[in-house]
Amino acid sequence: ELEYRLIRESKKYGSYVKGYSTTWKEIWKGLKKDDIAIEFCTYYSNNTEEYAAVLLEKKSKYPTVVRLFSQKQLSTIPTTDYYNTTALSNLIWKPLHHYLAEKKNVYFSPSGELNNIAIEYIPLTDKKTFAEYYNTYRLSSTRELIKNKREDIRTKAVLYGGLEYERGQGDIEAMRKELQSAESLIAFRDVPEIDSLVLRKGISFLEGTEREVQTIDTLLRNKQIPVALMSGMAGTEESFKQLSGQSITLLHVATHGFYSPLTGHYTAQRSFEEQALSRSGLFLSGAAASLNMKKIPEDIEDGILTAKELSKLDLSNLNLAILSACQTGLGEIVGDGVFGLQRGFKKAGAQTLLMSLWKVDDTATQLLMAEFYKNLVSGQNKRAAFLNAQKYLRSYQNGIYDKPEYWAAFIMLDGIH
């Protein structure tokens, strides 16, 4: 009965775009002999949350369901063991070993708590991670395999970084005048270097993000890619919302991300989603005033961009969004996915996301991002550019950043081309 229910539910995948549906047969037709598509899912049995995997491979004419483990079993593994032992692989990948034989490409869509774990980077053996044995692709849904892809990122780019989170009355008045007079807050021009940026009380200034976006700005401009660099007080929520409907293909946001777990019980799905999306977001220029409970004029945004607000934008031209911030991948976990920034961006229409799952080291992030963009502008596709940047970081200065805490935080979602 369980297998029948899971297979029946797998025939129609949910979509971030209303009215879009895909059958497993369409996905199956597009698979090659050495491909396997894995849709992880959760279900309840005897009041216990259980995990299973629905597998699609070319040699099987129907989906295969494999029961995996319970949430209770998962919770017994310390998070410190995730990327240093094979304990997690024994629950997730070992039961699928038979199906992975002779496979080269593994396309998987996580569910439940697996959204918050980089399961592609967990050790499969004492020497290698899962991703070192297979070409792994993390997907928001395996339906992504049959969607049309856009690989070109050269049209326009917008970079947010080195943001000032504090703002005084003068900043607010200046912003009001700019809003009244300017047609657009996004200008594709150079932005002067911001002086006297120091560590703040509350939301701390991320000094490394200023260097990060300046480096990326130079790399892109050298390749004749139009760039708008939003730093200091320029990286406002107003400017971000003006991206909606524009032909922006590359967006880089280097700032603080936030995630606040949802408390209480919500029976209505719509209410749950709205509440959960409101608890993930990004801090943009001027956000500290709102957090410090300062009064902000009604015609000025608070600088706190929630995933809910993000989801209502039109970012359908966005080929790649890079979220270089703390905990940007996190959100409220429910059965059909994660209600966080990744949900917000996908609902807005973004194709590929590169984001972090936990607080990231500033210097390591700068190194990884700079190398990623070097690879990208040299002609590598998104996935190759990312994987090679990880390898570079791990080998940097004789491996000072080789521990997973430095490089495994970043995941690429829907990075297929």
Q: At which residue positions do the language-model features occur?
A:
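Catalytic cores of enzymes
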Residues: S10-H417
